[in-house]
Regions:
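Low-complexity, intrinsically disordered P/S/T-rich segments
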Residues: 1-153, 158-161
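Catalytic-site microenvironment of enzymes
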Residues: 265
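P-loop NTPase catalytic phosphate-binding loop
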Residues: 9-16, 103-108, 112, 131-262, ...
Length: 297
C-alpha cells in the first residue's frame, strides 16, 4: 500500500469562530456563597478536632470538581497524621472520597473535598481565556481547569512524549479532541500539519478533509507504518536542515527563514549532478532555493 498526500491549498485559512462551540452560559455552574464555604470550613475544622487534629482552615478555593481547604496544623502536628485520616474525613463529611496532601513550598496541608455538583468545563471557556489567547506557546493545548478553577494550558512542543490512558468512558477521546481543536483554533495549516492514525476508524474520521492534514486519516495499519516511516525520514531531513543552518529547533529555523525573506536572501544546497567522466568521482553543484518555513508536524 502507498500513502497519498494532499496538495498544498492556496486558500487563506480562517480560524474557526468560538461561536461554533457550546456557550459558557448554557453549562451548569457550581457557585457556592462565601457563607456556605465558610460553614463547610468550620464543619471540617470540627471533624478534624474530633480526631484530635488541631489547626485552622486558612483559605477555601472552590474548583469545578473539588474544593481545596488549606489547613494550617497546630505546632508539632505531623502531616502524616492528617493524611492517614483521609477516609475518616470523607465519611464524616459525607463525601465519596477525600484527598489530603502537603502543598510544596508552604506550611499548610491541602484537603480536597468533591463538590455536590460537578461543574462542566467547556472548551469555549478555556479557548476564550487569556491563558490560551495570550500564550506564546508554539503548540498550545487547552487541558481544562486546575483545582482553583483557573484555565490550564500546556505547550505540546515542550513535551518529548504524551501518553493518554484511562478506563472506558473516562474521557480519553474527549481529551484528544480537545487537544486537536486547541491547535486548530490557534495555528494555520502553514504553521502546523497533522498526521492522524485511527485504526478503529471511528475516533478521528470527523477530521478528514481539514487543511491541516498531510494525508487522509490513516485507517489501514500497513499505511500507518508507511506514515510513521515517512515521519522519521522527515525528522532526519529537518535535523540536517537545522544543522546546516546552525539552529537547534524549528522555532529558531523559522526565525532565520523570516530574516532571509525580509532581506531577499536565498538559501543554497549542495546536490549531486552526476559523475566525472575521467575520474568517476561524483560531481556536485550549489543550487539556490527559496527559504520556506517549516511547519510543526
Amino acid at each position: 500500500p502507498s500513502l497519498s498526500f494532499f496538495q498544498e491549498s492556496s486558500e487563506e485559512y480562517q480560524i474557526p469562530k468560538l461561536s461554533l462551540l457550546q456557550n459558557i452560559h448554557s453549562s451548569t455552574k457550581n457557585i457556592l456563597s462565601d457563607d456556605a464555604l465558610n460553614e463547610n470550613a468550620r464543619m471540617l475544622e470540627n471533624v478534624l478536632d474530633d480526631y484530635g487534629v488541631k489547626g485552622e482552615i486558612l483559605s477555601v478555593k472552590p474548583g469545578p470538581v473539588v474544593t481545596l481547604y488549606e489547613l494550617e496544623p497546630a505546632a508539632g502536628l505531623k502531616a502524616n497524621r492528617v493524611i492517614s485520616l483521609a477516609d475518616d474525613i470523607a465519611r464524616s463529611m459525607s463525601a465519596l472520597a477525600t484527598r489530603v496532601s502537603t502543598i510544596p513550598g508552604r506550611s499548610v496541608i491541602g484537603i480536597e473535598l468533591p463538590n455536590d455538583i460537578r461543574e462542566k468545563v467547556l472548551l469555549r471557556e478555556i479557548l476564550s481565556s487569556r491563558a490560551y489567547g495570550d500564550s506564546n506557546y508554539q503548540l498550545p493545548l487547552a487541558l481544562g481547569k486546575n483545582i482553583g478553577g483557573e484555565p490550564v494550558v500546556a505547550n505540546l512542543a515542550r513535551m518529548p512524549h504524551l501518553l493518554i490512558a484511562g478506563t472506558t468512558g473516562s474521557g480519553k477521546s474527549v481529551g484528544i479532541n480537545t487537544m486537536i481543536l486547541s491547535l486548530l483554533y490557534k495555528l494555520s495549516p502553514d504553521q502546523c500539519k497533522l498526521i492522524m492514525i485511527d485504526p478503529k476508524m471511528l475516533e478521528l474520521s470527523v477530521y478528514d478533509g481539514i487543511p491541516h492534514l498531510l494525508s487522509p486519516v490513516v485507517t489501514d495499519p500497513k499505511k500507518a507504518v508507511i506514515a510513521l516511516k515517512w515521519a522519521v525520514a522527515e525528522m532526519e531531513e529537518r535535523y540536517r536542515k537545522m544543522s546546516k543552518m546552525g539552529v537547534r529547533n524549528i522555532e529558531s529555523f523559522n526565525l532565520r527563514v523570516k530574516e532571509a525573506i525580509k532581506n531577499n536572501e536565498n538559501f543554497t544546497r549542495t546536490v549531486q549532478i552526476g559523475f566525472d567522466e575521467n575520474t568517476g568521482e561524483p560531481k556536485f553543484e550549489e543550487q539556490s532555493i527559496k527559504p520556506e518555513y517549516l511547519p510543526f508536524i
